[in-house]
Amino acid sequence: NDIPIINTEKNPYLNNIIKAATIEKERLIGIFVDGDFFPGQKDAFSKLEYDYENIKIIYRNDIDFSIYDKKLSEIYMENISKQESMPEEKRDYHLLQLLKKELSDIQEGNDSLIKSYLLDKGHGWFDFYRNMAMLKAGQLFLEADKVGRYDLSTNSGCIYLDADMIITEKLGGIYIPDGIAVHVERIDGRASMENGIIAVDRNNHPALLAGLEIMHTKFDADPYSDGVCNGIRKHFNYSLNENYNSFCDFIEFKHDNIIMNTSQFTQSSWARHVS
């Protein structure tokens, strides 16, 4: 009967969300959830919405993502055709056989990129549906009928935050010059784009659509590295000849009122959850 969101001393994710909702009372705070919830858990979600007017539980089942889908069989057949169109000496026969096997293994009723991630239930599942949600952006709330007194248009933007990102004060107006920004981690002087924060100023941002296009063409595409990072690189015409750290500086979401990635200082709650 508890709210099914991790809330431990080391990883107070639910508390972080409630704190954000309390500070940002004029913003809608969506919690995008998926899973087979017990009736008591759904009741607990409803009570959370009642206690905090701007918190909205958005169930994955209530959102139609079909416009972003593609048949798995089409992805595999396109890659098979690509291999078979090559001169024999350049074909990867091991890959070709693997693609044909994967094609033959697709079960009836599961010929869908989106459904394949529903069967995954790992990090890929999280990453993929995060991308889908950010393509919808503010439209998520409208489609789930979770707007309340708040004013949203169909092309409203959205900020995604991992639950270990702590809002300390009101964020105020947020200016994203190129319409998209993401979290950037820096380790030993090397920067890398991360999906712990994704901010867009509208739905269907072309950088995320570019990532979706990669997901629709690569048989082994990854929702994080391809769906986000490579999509952003493609949209902004990033070249490997350019300085990657400088590109990360350009695309980074920066804000003084957010403490970033606090779970890096604790044992991973995800690792404990799946072990």
Region locations from a protein language model:
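Glycosyltransferase-associated regions of secretory-pathway enzymes
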Residues: 1-128, 159-275
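A generic hydrophobic-helix recognition signal that picks specific residues
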Residues: 120, 138, 155-157
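Solvent-exposed aromatic/hydrophobic patches embedded in short alpha-helical segments
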Residues: 125-140, 147-153
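Single-residue recognition of alpha-helix boundary sites
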Residues: 138-141, 173-175
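Short beta-strand-to-loop acidic/aromatic patch adjacent to the donor-nucleotide binding site
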Residues: 140-148, 157-164
